[in-house]
Amino acid sequence: MCPYFYWAIPCCCRGTRLGKRIAGINLSKNGSLAIINDGELEFYLEEERLSRIKRDRGAKYLVEKYLDGVDGVAICDCYTKYYPKKFLQRTKEKEAVCKVIRDKKIPILDYRQRHHECHAANARYGSPFDDCAVLVMDGKGSVHDHNGNRFCEIESIFDNENPVFKHYSTFWSEEECKKIEKPYWESMNTELLYSDRTSVGQAYRRVSRECGFDELDAGKTMGLSSYGSGRVDLFNEEYGHSLCSKELYAKEDSTGYYGNQKPVDLAYNLQKSAERHAIYMVAMAINLTNNNNVCVTGGFFLNCVSNYAIIKNVDVNLYVDPLSYDGGLSIGSAFLAYYEHFCN
């Protein structure tokens, strides 16, 4: 059983070849189901369309209705630090989904610890490129334990399917952040950065709360930014990377802001700082892979203004994943399962 989740998925297709129709199911926010048929996307739908619950994290209606004729199911998710009551509720919901799949006697593959890989697969296989770099930036992805500390992936760069850079952070926990004296690098086959800094996705959550919005209403914060002005310093180059300022810090309710800017100016600061950070990251992806074809994905890249800033400032052939938020994980996990268990 995966140590970060308390509901087990029996992976009954390990070492076997699956049929041609593979389903992917996302059980994080924007719960969704996708079907890949012989390497082509055949079907995609989000649970909220059936349940009428905005950003519904489940997939109960989807698995009951749309799994006929499917040869295997890939399950993906995202690590989230729940309060105990909410954790128990979410565990029951996820187990109910898995029970429906088991009752249908469909093999299950566990992709819950491959969050950024699923994002990257969705972008790469949906792009027009045969050879490309893939950049993933979001709030948080899968858990990674290292030197006795627990991190979450927040930025990843892939050379096609091969990881060349990973940024792991403890930002989601005040207790974990205190264990890291300063960001540090390690080099193996992949360049690894460990830090206590906030991800760009989480930065939008915190600033959105500070501006009086729901933490998932980053689009409102982006819109508000057009009315602001002032300094641009929430992402800066230090420790060999572009990192979020400590003005945004780990806090249980995600607000975490030390500064004193007005909401409109704080939104402006974050938007312009995030644009600068995105430009830095795309340039880094090109340098690490020696490839000007770059796919970008992860919830941050719903930021159209930032995407345009990349095009204006970087010599790049840019593909922006249209389903870069977590809903697209179902497509990515289905593609991964298809190419790992059917084509190979």
What are these regions (language model features)?
Residues 2-344:
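Short acidic/glycine-rich loops and adjacent helix/strand connectors
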